[in-house]
Design a protein with these regions (language model features):
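Beta-strand-rich binding/interaction modules
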Residues: 177, 260-296, 644-676, 691, ...
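Acidic-aromatic substrate-binding/catalytic surfaces of carbohydrate-active enzymes
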Residues: 76-129, 720, 724-729, 762-848
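Extended acidic/polar, glycine-enriched regions
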Residues: 201-204, 268-351, 704-749
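Intrinsically disordered, low-complexity Pro/Gly/Ser/Thr-rich segments with frequent PxxP/GP/PP motifs
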Residues: 293-312, 669-700
Length: 849
């Protein structure tokens, strides 16, 4: 078998020579060597009891490796590491047995080497960190990391197939076991599995890995994020019996008016054990509600298909994420357990109908956000605890959807979104934004790149297809448009007709089930509805949340609530991609752009800080605006004299029975009236009228406000009891009416008799208790006297400027609008007139700016 593998590798290297480089890492036609075919993610355990025991653990513990109950060993931890400036400087024989690595440094796996003292991370939005000449990457400065560690295979794994699993390595790597080449892989965001059984020996085994910072794959990984390298996700060994489940596909939809569950399961077996048993169970909260066994009667009996109708099930959606548990177990002919695995799933349907994306028959509104995987100390290497924290904040701030920008995430993220309830747009690791400055413009029409395009999309779909929370596939981001995307669309729709497929790059002309532009203006939403496109419009990116931002979010949602075809969008983005470090003076800073030590390399400054939350997940002010706009309970005044309020339930599926309403009348920041009540029975997307039992407020010259708040009645997963989910506030006048147009006029403050005087220097208007004067030289108000006190220090000037925000700077606002900064000071008086109009004295000043 080893001889056969070496023959295959030799042929691949010969094929690669056509590119002028005898290396796969500069050849888009070669993206893997000896890598196992992609399959659905699952973790096998020794038996059903152990699988269910692990599944029952709290989320923060459930994903930890447990050697006592599963045939899996973590290779995370301390490895020996050597950093080289390029491939030529990297030792050519470090993978061989007997090579001495004692003088090498230590490094932690998983983790980017740039964040552990080797080289520096680079932040760019669009530009590649090297001159673009696809598929070639620099050879003079293309850092290479050499990793080495030892491991021991448990004796009881004898006779089983043993696999090496890298969950994510950036950007390309080789791996050797005991001096033998085990394989090669590209695509930094999907796992690479290698069958290393032929290379193993009793006792200690040597594992060596060679990672390239840049490869041809880097041309498809040009996301608006930091550029790192290294082994960034977990590494495992795992063992499986030769007779095993190779893959499975689960489709659990809804039928009969979305009331019954339509269960379809396809299992692919590897080397079926004659006389063995495949057993399938479906469990609901620990109780078996369905069970089926099949005996293997032929060595060619590799397919197992099962269909079943579950009446009156509880459907899954983001508001009520009801999950069932699939348990698949295999047994040998003697009835001995071979292995078992579980897959939590929900019954959920996705349809495209009447220009809308329907979840369980409802045109849900996607109150979404884009989320990069980011940690303020470890970059792309994140923890399960941080994932749970993200979901907790999203749920508490009324978000219900996430786009995995712009690559497949760690598998734990999908399991958690299944459990806690978030809709997911799962995005392939395809972005070649930097090609827009290249003569070719895009790689999507280059036939040499069809293979990596297809592998990146298909492998993501194959891994993630059993995740209920995924309601849309995305083919990538900002890579132009071309025939490769049409090929990806056709393949994905054929393989998985149960979900829509989207891509923003082609605009209205793209093969995309959803029109999903980025940063469309508010008027573009109205245009989409008017032109009657047959697709829903869901913004893949909008409301750029950089600095003081999201100020016009309500403008978008006024239209989204009005038109069914507008179904929301995904804010850019969730978390600032900054680092918690100290500057040269020892002061703590949030580092961005060029702050991380790479001198002389272009960077895009603080454009990586676009989050609703900071890198440590502390809250930015604008997330409160998002919470308000995204809230599910809306209040509208009907008639304050009768104390009536209209309440609208904008949930997609649930009523308001789990919420209570608290009302308060406040003045000068203090409550003077308050009360609490239940909401009336209200189905999703319905309205009702309620009466607030408040007393009329006194006419005492104070400002009074009515504040309405909705709170949770009980604790829910990640959301505490008493959590505020919605609020509204209106100003009241003494008659109890809302001040719809709160204004004041001079007649409220002064006697109705106004005298005027005009001199060469000024125009003056005088009443019983006030005097206002305007300069005839420049038109400025020079005096505002009220009750004997001058209220202004000097002449008032109009100001057409404010402090710039980050978004202003980023879109060249100063260049476009800078002329207005000093317009008030540079004003030239054109005319000043005084006349009486309807018993009112009007002073009109006309100024040119």
């Amino acid at each position: 078998m080893k001889h056969s593998l070496h023959t295959v590798l030799t042929l691949l290297f010969v094929c690669a020579s056509a590119w002028g480089e005898n290396v796969p890492w500069q050849n888009p036609q070669i993206n893997e060597i000896n890598r196992e075919p992609a399959h659905a993610h699952f973790i096998p355990y020794t038996n059903e009891a152990n699988a269910l025991k692990q599944q029952a653990l709290p989320a923060a513990q459930r994903f930890a490796v447990n050697p006592a109950t599963e045939r899996r060993i973590s290779l995370d931890g301390t490895w020996k590491f050597l950093f080289s400036k390029n491939n030529e400087e990297c030792p050519t024989d470090f993978y061989k047995m007997g090579y001495n690595t004692k003088r090498w440094k230590d490094i932690q796996v998983p983790g980017s080497w740039e964040l552990q003292g080797f080289d520096s991370p680079i932040y760019t939005d669009v530009a590649y960190p090297f001159p673009a000449n696809p598929p070639h990457v620099p050879t003079d400065y293309n850092p290479v990391g050499a990793y080495v560690r030892e491991f021991t295979v448990p004796a009881h794994w004898k006779g089983m197939d043993i696999f090496l699993d890298f969950e994510g390595v950036e950007s390309a790597f080789y791996c050797w076991v005991n001096g033998e080449l085990a394989g090669y892989s590209e695509d930094s965001r999907l796992p690479a599995h290698f069958n290393i059984t032929p290379f193993l020996k009793a006792g200690k085994n040597k594992l060596a890995v060679k990672v390239f910072r840049y490869s041809d794959g880097s041309y498809l990984e040009d996301q608006d994020y930091w550029k790192y390298s290294g082994i960034e996700r977990d590494v495992y060994l795992y063992a499986r019996p030769q007779s095993r489940v190779q893959d499975f596909k689960l489709v659990a939809g809804l039928t009969n008016g979305y009331k019954d569950g339509d269960f379809n399961l396809d299992i692919t077996l590897h080397k079926p054990h004659l006389g063995g048993i495949v057993e399938v169970k479906v469990m609901d909260k620990g109780n078996v509600i369905y069970q089926h066994k099949k005996e293997i009667t032929s060595a060619t009996d590799t397919l197992f298909a099962q269909k079943h109708l579950f009446p009156a099930i509880l459907p899954w959606n983001a508001e009520t994420p009801n999950l069932y548990t699939l348990v698949v177990s295999t047994y040998d002919a003697q009835g001995k357990a071979l292995e078992s695995f579980t897959q939590p799933f929900g019954f959920r349907s996705v349809e495209m109908r009447n220009g809308m994306q329907l979840i369980n028959g409802v045109a849900v509104l996607f109150k979404g956000v884009n989320r990069h995987e980011h940690d303020p100390h470890h970059g792309r290497t994140i923890t399960v605890e941080s994932m749970i924290k993200d979901i907790q904040l999203m749920k508490q701030f009324n978000l219900n959807a996430v786009r995995t920008c712009h690559y497949p995430n760690r598998y734990e993220w999908y399991a958690l979104c299944n459990e806690y309830g978030l809709y997911l747009v799962d995005e392939a690791n395809i972005e070649s934004h930097g090609m827009q400055a290249h003569k070719d413009g895009t790689l999507a029409n280059n036939p040499d790149w069809e293979v990596p395009f297809m592998q990146r999309m298909s492998r993501m779909v194959l891994r993630d297809r059993n995740i209920t929370a995924i309601v849309t596939w995305s083919m990538g981001n900002e890579s132009g448009y071309g025939k490769h995307f049409e090929t990806l669309y056709d393949w994905t729709k054929k393989f998985d007709p149960t979900r829509p497929v989207q891509y923003e790059g082609g605009g209205y002309d793209a093969k995309s089930d959803i029109y999903c532009p980025m940063y469309a203006r508010v008027w573009a939403l109205r245009r989409h509805v008017n032109q009657r496109d047959a697709r829903p419009m869901i913004l893949c990116e909008y409301a750029h949340a950089m600095g003081n931002s999201v100020g016009n979010l309500q403008d978008y949602w006024d239209l989204i609530y009005k038109y069914d075809q507008l179904q929301g969008g995904f804010i850019w983005d969730w978390v600032d991609a900054t680092f918690d470090i100290k500057d040269k003076n020892g002061n703590k800073i949030w580092a961005y752009g060029g702050d991380m030590g790479f001198v002389g390399v272009p960077n895009d400054s603080n454009f990586c800080a676009n989050g609703l939350v900071a890198a440590d997940r502390s809250l930015h002010p604008h997330i409160w605006e998002v919470k308000k706009v995204y809230q599910y309970i809306h209040f509208d005044p009907v008639a304050f004299t009768t104390k009536q309020i209209k309440v609208t339930n904008w949930h997609d599926f649930i009523g308001l029975e789990d919420y209570k309403l608290h009302w308060t009348v406040e003045t000068d920041g203090k409550a003077v009236q308050s009360g609490e009540m239940d909401f009336p029975v209200m189905a999703a997307r319905s309205s009702a009228f309620i009466t607030i039992p408040m007393n009329l407020i006194p006419n005492d010259g104070k400002e009074y406000f009515l504040k309405l708040e909705a709170f949770t009645k009980k604790e829910a997963p990640l959301v505490p009891k008493g959590h505020q989910v919605a609020m509204e506030q209106w100003q009241l006048n003494p008659e109890g009416e809302r001040l719809l147009n709160a204004t004041w006029t001079a007649r409220e403050l002064v006697d109705k008799t106004v005298n005027t005087e005009r001199t060469p220097d000024a125009i003056t208007l005088t009443g019983e208790n006030f005097r206002i004067a305007f300069s005839t030289a420049d038109g400025e108000m020079t005096e505002l006297l009220y009750n004997g006190k001058n209220l202004i220090k000097e002449g008032l000037q109009p100001n057409f400027w404010r402090a710039l925000t980050d978004n202003d700077v980023a879109n060249n606002h100063l260049e476009r609008c800078g002329i207005w900064k000093f317009a008030g000071k540079n004003a030239k008086l054109q005319s000043i007139d005084l006349k009486e109009d309807s018993n009112k004295q009007l002073a009109t000043v006309t100024v040119n700016y």
